[in-house]
Amino acid sequence: MSDFRQPGPRAWRRLDGVKTDDVALEKARDSRYEAVRSRDARFDGAFFFAVETTGIYCRPSCPAVTPKRSNVRFFATAAAAQGSGFRACRRCRPDAVPGSADWNVRADVVGRAMRLIGDGVVDREGVAGLAGRLGYSARQVQRQLTAELGAGPVALARAQRSHTARVLLQTTALPVTEIAFASGFASVRQFNETIRAVYAATPSELRAAAPARSRTGAPSAGIPLRLAHRGPYQAGPVFDLLQREAVAGVEEVSGPTGRRLYRRTLRLPYGTGIVAVDERPGGTRNGSGGWLDARLHLTDLRDLTTAVQRLRRLLDLDADPYAVDERLGADPRLAPLVDARPGLRSPGTADPDEFAVRALAGRAEAERLVQRYGKTLDAPCGTLTHLFPEPGVLAEAEPYGAPGALAAALADGAVRLDPGADRGDAERALLAVPGVDAATAAVVRARALGDPDVAPPGAAVPDTWRPWRSYALSHLRAAGEWENHR
């Protein structure tokens, strides 16, 4: 229970829900106001600011006239700003920025909770389900999130539902009633009230504000997405890796380098999906960010939020390349590599259990498992014909050997790789599975659990690369220098 800190002295104040002393408070406010004044997009998603005279909250890079310092308030999350009565700016759309990289880096209960909320756990299982996954009471989780972020799990999930609803309203022609329930709202009335409170507009007005050409006519056409990223993004090495690892029937990478299309099947809580992601950059914002274009086909629209979050983890879109490049670029051995590939990512996975089995079995064996035990899609799409077999199916079908042992451990919960799993506990549980060695456990920790600071066992990796050793290894591999470095 050491993750939970006791309340500090009364002399402390709050900034973004984080307790701090008066001097640190003023310094933090000054630095954040400077980021707002200079419209520094590097801080988009790291914090939000609200203007008391207008009732609007924005991202730091908002192009609107900079408000007076005395009228500005700062928040750690969009949910905290919404909870204080502020509405999203229609000009900079602060709800659409990449999430804070902290939630992927942090291994404490707040980071784990934010990853689970992003995966839709609160919508599916409620606060009690979230707390149970974290191993704490609902009251403890509420208190910790509110203390650090200025918003509890319900408010954080509400902000996420609002964003999902806006995406569906502005990119599809689905009836508003369907969108309400697909976004996770319990009723149309709750949906209407929330949209009006968050965006100062009715759902119909929000839809009318988007160009009609941006909306797809039917669910079969898929949902067009702009998967935003912070700072520079090196799509080439990510797609190279996806192409090398692609398992036939489940994944496909097609097209020439620089214009490749990655497609894969998805097993989701309510149904299945197929996603296509374009390698070509979709655009930039002042040279400091942009997006990847994607199209998502779902059998159940309630899976939209979860599917998007899993794609973001696969492509490592919420990373902070500025922090990573600054630390690694200070090392003489890595500086030329960082200069050559600024914003290089450490890819994750769209399905942690699937990745763990594949990492242990290898590509050829994984393809055999798919063809023999994978579930055939009701509507195959070209070469995408199957879902990767679930752990329970593999454990029953092939109980012998290392992949079967791992599948059994995943199926019975002995090994947990969900977004809220404790990384240290998961690695120890993996090492207890017969046939799983330290190298496999390390790659699963880096890719399936999204740990940014993993070094292969026995590798001569300096501590000065912490907390970004996973990214350092990505640079060495992309440059073809990993074998020499080892």
What are these regions (language model features)?
Residues 2-486:
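HhH-family (HhH-GPD) DNA N-glycosylase catalytic core used in base-excision repair
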